[in-house]
Curated annotation (Swiss-Prot):
GO terms for biological process: acetate metabolic process; acetyl-CoA biosynthetic process. This is Acetate kinase. Its cofactor is Mg(2+); Mn(2+). Its EC number is 2.7.2.1. Homodimer. The record marks 182, 243 as: Transition state stabilizer. The lineage of its organism: Bacteria, Bacillati, Actinomycetota, Actinomycetes, Kitasatosporales. Mg(2+). Can also accept Mn(2+). It is an enzyme of class 2 (transferase).
């Protein structure tokens, strides 16, 4: 029997998201989420996609091992268990791969060691990713396990974009450079944008705007990232739901010296109490837009600051690329907020950017153009699909490895 299924795992600090995908036709067989791991009120939500059948269970799930065993049991109830000969591999989302991992990688002890070494630059994510990998390995030690890194797509950035202007000895000692994040999404969306235009990815220059609670922009030339807005951490760049984005670093010294704040307090301020939330008390763009429509000044200023930063990055990446074929909006805000898309390109007609009001207002599930007919630069809404991208990269890698069970 051929093995064509890939289980995609995204292990967070207290959650596990998963999808089981058949790579013959891209069909999603099952999907689910285990949340509040380690609490008495843990919950597992499992969906058999084709049947539209969703099951939920609540109760204590002690750790990631128990969570994955519960996932395996739910899949087994549907005849899709981890012991199925049709399961080709497990693909793991790993947030930080540093400068070492530029492509999906078969996991062995050396890979695990390197992911562990990167914990200081990804303390919130890599430990949970490691736990998920080790738990999955314990459940299926014979099955190929593949790491797909959020940072990998950005390793093609030139040194002029990846380096900070500080002493290189210090930068190298502490691994300080611009890694970028959301790379799996940027890779998928840039490729799908080229498909939407009917062109090969290698022929297209795209500015991708991944706008969710976390937000990032990337400049993609011919399918390769040449710049991105996030840096050493996801704090750099665009204004986000709770993160400040770009800011004068001296603000930190000022808060320490004058405000008496500790490094941890400032970390919390900039990552969890800033951005849209810090400006107006809301990080949900829908609520912010409702308040804007009611002439709420705080919400209006927050929206204007958000859009101002977005415009700056669009302009900067236009300059970096030299020629832009498309600007693609993706993720929760990018896919669903017509006002954000309209405001982001307003006044940029000189760069060939505009949206058609009617097309922009239409809600849809698939990739679509929202620029006027004949526009010099296409403006598109392209739903991201990180799970499919992880599955695709995982299956391609294990297929190349020569497994005779794969077709």
């Amino acid at each position: 029997m051929s093995s064509t299924r890939v289980l995609v795992l995204n292990s967070g600090s207290s959650s596990v998201k998963y999808q089981l995908i058949d790579m013959r036709d891209g069909e999603r067989l099952a999907a689910g989420l285990v949340e509040r791991i380690g609490e008495r009120t843990s919950r597992l939500r499992h969906t058999l996609v084709a049947a539209g059948d969703t099951r939920e269970q609540e109760g204590p799930i002690a750790d990631h091992e128990a969570a994955l065993k519960a996932v395996a049991a739910e899949l087994g109830r549907d005849g899709l268990g981890l012991d199925s000969p049709e399961l080709a591999a497990i693909g793991h989302r790993v947030v930080h791969g540093g400068e070492f991992f530029s492509e999906p990688t078969l996991i062995d002890e050396n890979v695990l060691t390197e992911i562990e070494r990167l914990i200081p630059v990804a303390p919130l994510h890599n430990p949970a990713n490691l736990t998920g990998i080790r738990t999955a390995q314990a459940l299926r030690p014979d099955l190929p396990q593949v790491a797909v890194f959020d940072t990998a797509f950005h390793t093609t950035m030139p040194e002029s974009a990846a380096r900070y202007a500080i002493d290189p000895k210090i930068a190298d000692r502490y691994r300080i450079r611009r890694y970028g994040f959301h790379g799996t999404s940027h890779a998928y969306v840039s490729r799908e944008t080229a498909r939407l235009l009917g062109r090969a990815p290698g022929d297209v220059n795209v500015i991708v705007l991944h706008l969710g609670n976390g937000a990032s922009a990337s400049a993609v030339r011919g399918g390769r990232c040449v710049d991105t807005s996030m840096g050493l951490t996801p704090l750099e760049g665009l204004v986000m739901g709770t993160r400040s984005g770009d800011m004068d670093p001296a603000v930190i010294f000022h808060l320490m010296r004058v405000g008496g704040m500790s490094a941890d307090e400032i970390d919390t301020l900039l990552n969890k109490r800033s951005g849209l939330f810090g400006l107006c008390g809301d990080n949900d763009m829908r609520e912010i837009r409702r308040r804007v429509d009611e002439d709420d000044e705080q919400a209006g200023l927050a929206f204007d600051i958000y859009i101002h930063r977005l415009k700056k990055y669009i302009g900067a990446y236009y300059a970096v690329l030299g020629r832009v074929d498309a600007v693609a909006f993706t993720a929760g805000v990018g896919e669903n907020s017509a006002p954000v898309r309209e405001a982001a390109v307003a006044g940029l007609e000189g760069l060939g950017l505009a949206v058609d009001g009617g097309l922009n207002a239409v809600r849809g599930d698939g990739a679509r153009l929202i620029s006027p007919a004949g526009a010099r630069v296409a403006v598109a809404v392209v739903p991201t699909d990180e799970e499919m991208e992880i599955a695709t990269q995982t299956y391609a890698l294990v297929s190349e490895s020569g497994n005779p069970d794969l077709t």
